[in-house]
Amino acid sequence: MKVRIRGIFATALTKLALDWGFSIVQPTGKIVERFDLPVDNSPPDVTVIDHESKSGVVVLGKCGAVEAFVERLREAVDPVVVKADLGVHDVFVGKVVGEGRVEGPGGIVLRVPPRFAPTVGSVGVFTVVRPPLGPVEGVAVPDIIVEGDYVELSTSPGVRFSRHIPEGERVRLRLLAETRLGWLGGLGVRFKSSARFAEDEAVVREAEALYRELVELAKGGEAGAVLRRGRCLALALFDKAAKERLDEVRRSVVPTARGHHALRAQGLGKCLDLLDYLGVEAYERAAEFLARGAVEIWHIKPWGEMVKMRGEAVGVFGDWLVVKRPLRPGGVLDGIGVKIERGFYALTCVPRRGNYVVHTYYTPEGRAVGTYINVNSEPEWGRRIIYIDLLVDVAYVGGEAKVLDLEEYRRYEDVFPARLRPPSGVLSPPVACGERGIIEAPPQSASS
């Protein structure tokens, strides 16, 4: 199987993929140099790219290849893995069950963008353009999109290009569309990134085959039927421990400092290359140095959604980083039930070691109104405080503890490796976050 790998994990994942027997296609110049690879620009069976958090990868491609890659990744790195129930460009017969909603295969309801406005009760052919992942709603359009190695054909007219195709190649491919694909008429064509390496004849042959498929798909079928499978999609998220395993793999290829991938997620570039070259063991100090001034807390859901919370680092006290965050008035504190008034703020305590983050909420006068403990993977310090949410939370109000979101955790428990399952004993002892770190009892104002 052929894999194309891009992003900050490319060296480590290329080493693993080669060990697993995958062929590397369309490698970057740096990867060719590091592994002494022959240049193979044939289309991939599976593509691996960074997730937006830089703490995981999106795996997209032929279903068998995606499954094989992800399972080997589980064995080697032990990440959090979520697989989409539907594929990108699955073509199906759907029934419109509400305004902007279509029922797809297996009763899954997907959102239809407002510009299409299909009639409620109608049945037609749809294509998945964004698969549902976890609780995140998927998106389908009442178009037919058929995808090959080099091109996609669709019932939406126009000529489009992958953003990875340079301008010079776009000129060639646009000319090809005008001179050799004019018979497509009102159909649309999108040139995929692999098209820049393809001979014109190969592109034309594929377009002809896809056109014949599209004509057959337009005939439809029974509601709920999948007429054509697209590309499978999976998300693998790397917590701090998984990144350390990837550091070890990378170290077997090139000099790699401890914490390399965690620091890459902080956005470090040339200075990290220098640490790698010098072999300096400076991860803890570097992470602590970065966690000064303005910081962001990146709360990553297992299915890839990110909640970003901005704050100001108060300081490091022992093994705790304290962050002060202003709260936007008008809402209600989740799990605590107190309305957020103007001037409310949170003190967040982030451990150097541990699997939870403590948020204590305060009035403008400094009176604590409750504490919310998020159970998560071990946080990574820096200007971005990064962790993966394990979906279980504990709220303390008036000395009483409430466990939150257990049902959600049980629904997604299988996506977590065993080592990240929420620990027992999170309810005791009750703690709170103060300006100088963790305290055992919630602080009270003088008037309390």
Swiss-Prot record:
Q: Does Hydrolase show up as a keyword for this record?
A: yes
Q: Which InterPro entries match?
A: DUF402, FomD-like_sf, Ntdp-like, RNA-bd_FAU-1
Q: EC number(s) of the enzyme?
A: 3.1.26.-
Domain of life, source organism: Archaea
Judged by the first EC level, this protein's enzyme class is: hydrolase
For the biological process aspect of GO, one term held by this record is: rRNA processing
Annotated GO MF terms? mRNA 3'-UTR AU-rich region binding; RNA endonuclease activity, producing 5'-phosphomonoesters
The alphabetized UniProt keywords are: Endonuclease, Hydrolase, Nuclease, RNA-binding, rRNA processing
Role of this protein = Probable RNase involved in rRNA stability through maturation and/or degradation of precursor rRNAs. Binds to RNA in loop regions with AU-rich sequences.
HAMAP family in UniProt: RNA_binding_AU_1
Concerning its family, UniProt says: Belongs to the FAU-1 family.
Can you say what this protein is called? Answer: Probable ribonuclease FAU-1
